[in-house]
Amino acid sequence: MKRAAFLFIIITGIVCFAIACARSDEVRKTEATLYFVDAEINRLLPYTCELIDADPQHMAEAAVEMLIEGRDDNDKIRRLIPKDKSCISTRVDGGTAYVDLSSDITETLPYSRDIEKLFIYQIVDTLTGIKGIRFVKFTVDGVVKKDFMGYYDMRETYKFVYPE
């Protein structure tokens, strides 16, 4: 009887340990806000989505990928970022996201101060909404430039502007 009770306790302990240590197949996700330009090109529209809960670098890459993918199914949103994954790359270091833009993007954007502002802050407001990112700095083709389209100083450090 003692032997059976002892075996029962040991087996129960092993099962409990195995259950506690079992890896969950469930992927943890976190809510994020992406900003898209409205159809009239007047303002940014917040769009809530879920990103895989990871470090800021991976979350920034996923958010930028979603911005590039766009919301073409929504007629209230206008695409400013071309649907080309090589047009934007990101790197996160010390709370700052470094965003490298391809100069080819300017070929698809109409020249306007408002459009440049919406384009920049669509990226800035999306990235600064990610835990661990407070600021955004831009380069164009890997080089820090004075401006992107002639209106905004790309040497600046940008932070969140548009409240929800």
Predicted regions and their residues:
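Bimodal "functional hotspot" detector
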Residues: 2-11, 15-164
